[in-house]
Amino acid sequence: MSAARTASELALRIVQSLWLCGVRDIVLAPGSRSAPLALTLDAADRAGDVRLHVRVDERSAAFLALGLTTGSRRPVAVVTTSGTAVGNLLPAVMEAHHTGRRLVVVSADRPDRLRGTGANQTTQQAGLFGVFAECDDLTPEVSDAELDADVARACSRRGPTQLNVQLDGDLLPPDPDPAAWWHRPDDLEHRNDSAGAELRAEAESDPRSTSTGADPASASGVDVEPSVSISTDGEVLPLGPRTVVVAGDDAGPAARMLAEAAGWPMLAEPTSGARIGRQALRTGRLLLTTDLRGRIERVVVIGHPTLSRPVTSLISDPSLEVLAVRGRDGVATDPGRVARVLDVVPRVEAADDPTWFDSWHDADVRLSALIDAGLAAAQGDPQRAPGLDVGLSPLSVAAVVASAVEADTSLVVGSSNAVRDLDVMGSPWPPLQHRFVVGNRGLAGIDGTVSTAIGIALGRPRAARTIAYLGDLTFLHDSNGLLVGSGQPRPDLTFVVLNDDGGAIFSTLEQGDPRYSSAFERVFATPHGTDLAALCAAHHTAHERVEDLDRLARALAESPTGIRVLEVPVSRADRRAEAAWLRSLAQQALSRATGDAERS
């Protein structure tokens, strides 16, 4: 054990170690106990060595950090004071755990001797996150080697880590000159263990860390931090069984590579990173409600699919051969516990019979055309698309948003209906054109989406533009994310908020059965009547109410400065009928495709 450091000395050493491990963005929620860390970070930011983001709400701060690490692919730290401040980080820590994001929580704490004494703002916060984050409880006596190793492990771990820092004594540095609060470490060649050295090499070789380098994800269309393991030693799958590839959230290019090599249909969710090329189906989850579902013999699951019950039913079917590949968090998606789990993506040595893919592709093309034609007709005559009202359809809005996502665009998608509408209306994008489409799908919650989107936009400054597409409840749940203080980094970001005054997704579930209508509005739909324009004005955020699809398309083609909100009012009255309409179109599409095949 080393001699005890002052609080300022311990804070300096921690920030230096974070910097050595490639951390360049740090989010701070202010407080008294964390003062030594705050002053060190302010000085490091002024020196240009880190970019500091200050937020008054710890919950928002944590999701901002989550967005920053998702967008930049670097570890990001979030710093808080003691007490309930730490507890407010839990939702983002849970999401980071389930998505394998490198989120480093630096929680300031009282010294150990005050725990259990009733001292102000003192609780058992070391290990507060339980199974969701490993914890190192750092004392003023921690040795340089131990501290550096702890920080290096935190920055390299695929998932969140808590560094709980016991700060004792005087919380302010003796020298009031900010120049004395921060300096880069002097012994760069010898600090930190091998994990830290690897991270430093990674950061130094990353073209994004230079002013002239291009984002490798944008340049190649390949995720520089693969979510699943790709290896030439992957298991070789025999051809013959009628196979589909299910690409869930964060599947990455591996799913597309397998589907293309084998010639199999691929059901790729919008946030999969694999919804590219001919093998990807736009309406795959709808086609699972048709007879095509019964012809499937084998399923390969890559990533974390969460969007539909037909897909969950498919990958849980014990009568099928189901193969599930572990994700970056080490977990394979196998809700039915029927899959054979693989550590790496399997491979094939030849392409399969094309007639299997053709049957899916033909039905997908026909169903897509039927949906588009029905929506177009409903804009002028609702009788031509039964169940759909006149006015803006949420599906039509999703189509406009999808069309606005050009090459090198970042799109952040909220949970609930927004991502599901995009799943139906977003056609697969052409190969060799990268779109960065992400959402908080680890636990699929609506919380923190505004802050996450701001973090992603800040983490990907070279993106052509960043759009966030979300519902009104998702927006309101994290409206504190718009509270960006004066002088703080502020991205160019457009929010498209689909405002149907409540929770429309419940109308498509069991709760939406008309037999339960007496309680539905109050306990599920939860209409709020909030004036989003006034809310945005209070946060000095640009706002526009858009009631026309053409205007929405034009607005999304603009290049705004700063954050703006495009509010699109829609009705949720037809959501249940809309779901039934889509299922009926799927049956029509398969019947027509089958009839054409028989005639040919």
Give short role names for the model-derived ranges.
Residues 11-15, 19-22, 32-38, 364-463, ...:
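Active-site diphosphate/adenylate-binding microenvironment
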Residues 6-79, 87, 425:
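N-terminal cofactor/phosphate-binding cores enriched in small/glycine residues
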Residues 96, 107-150, 268-377, 485:
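Glycine-rich, acidic loop regions that bind phosphate or pyrophosphate groups
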Residues 14, 21-25, 70-80, 86, ...:
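Structural signature of the thiamine diphosphate
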Residues 66, 70, 81-82, 88, ...:
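Glycine-rich, anion-gripping cofactor-binding loops and their flanking helix/strand elements
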Residues 5, 132, 153-238:
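Conformationally flexible catalytic loops at phosphate/diphosphate-handling active centers
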